[in-house]
């Protein structure tokens, strides 16, 4: 379905299944199809696969290039769908977006699975940090000639952006947070552990033999983790089912 923000910007979201809502947030210059192997979960849950502004089938990002702006646009979408509580599942920059959203609109968050995210640019290992600068420069250059790369260059600065949320907000969060990385990830291990420690109900998990793409490379484990989190959340707190406003 297509949703139009107050700004006129268009967000594309695929909604599958029924039940407890799980919102999937993809990484930088990717799209919701990244989570293709998670669609099997529609048998048990309501799944929302969101293309962030400037990505995938969504319209162009017209406002500022920031996680805060994307988080507020996501809030407009979820509010329009009358979602009271949901589990946020974010990969890479999508994990950063999930954390930014939780800091700004925590009342709608029932839990977070943050896979391979980094709340500061310094949380990346050296070579991936260097690659971010190279990628951004390459997109800008190619964008002078090719529209597809011009679009990529619009959102690539997010690769270097920090999550702008006071840590005190996270320390008061009542919901469970799982920070998942691979032992071959581009995110520093100590950085991921520090993110988990920000939350009273934070938990750090490291998957052996995996890198930055656990949802694709180890989907059985990833899906089981999502199921477990969603089931535990439902046992602890009654949550409403997604409803569409007429």
PLM segments and residue spans:
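Flexible "cap/lid" loop of the alpha/beta hydrolase fold
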Residues: 96-104, 110-138
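Active-site nucleophile elbow and catalytic-triad environment of alpha/beta-hydrolase enzymes
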Residues: 153-169, 184-187
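Conserved loop-alpha-helix segment in the C-terminal half of the alpha/beta-hydrolase fold
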Residues: 39, 181-210
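Conserved HGGG/HGGXW glycine-rich cap/lid loop of the alpha/beta-hydrolase fold
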Residues: 9-57
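Catalytic histidine-centered segment of alpha/beta-hydrolase-like enzymes
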Residues: 210-223
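Conserved alpha/beta-hydrolase "nucleophile elbow" surrounding the catalytic nucleophile
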Residues: 86, 90-95
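Active-site loop/oxyanion-hole signature of alpha/beta-hydrolase fold enzymes
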Residues: 48-87
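Short beta-strand/loop motif that positions the catalytic acidic residue
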Residues: 173, 179-181
């Amino acid at each position: 379905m297509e949703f139009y923000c107050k700004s006129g910007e268009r967000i594309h979201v695929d909604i599958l299944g029924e039940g407890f809502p799980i919102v999937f947030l993809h990484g930088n210059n990717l799209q919701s199809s990244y989570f293709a192997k998670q669609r099997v979960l529609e048998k048990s849950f309501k799944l929302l696969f969101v293309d962030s502004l400037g990505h995938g089938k969504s319209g162009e990002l017209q406002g500022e290039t920031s996680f805060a702006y994307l988080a507020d646009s996501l809030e407009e979408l979820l509010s329009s769908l009358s979602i009271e509580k949901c589990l946020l599942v974010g990969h890479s920059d999508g994990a950063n977006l999930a954390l930014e959203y939780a800091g700004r609109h925590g009342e709608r968050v029932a839990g977070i699975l943050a896979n391979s995210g980094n709340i500061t640019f310094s949380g990346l290992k050296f070579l991936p940090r260097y690659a971010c600068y190279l990628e951004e420069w390459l997109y800008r250059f190619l964008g002078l000639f090719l529209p597809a790369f011009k679009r990529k260059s619009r959102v690539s600065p997010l690769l270097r952006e920090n999550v702008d949320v006071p840590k005190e907000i996270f320390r008061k969060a009542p919901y469970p947070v799982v920070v998942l990385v691979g032992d071959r990830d581009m995110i520093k291990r100590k950085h991921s552990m520090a993110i988990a420690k920000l939350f009273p109900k934070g938990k750090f998990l490291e998957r052996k033999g995996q890198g930055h793409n656990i949802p694709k490379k180890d989907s059985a484990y990833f899906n089981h983790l999502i199921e477990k989190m969603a089931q535990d959340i439902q046992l602890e707190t009654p949550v409403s089912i997604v409803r569409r406003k007429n």
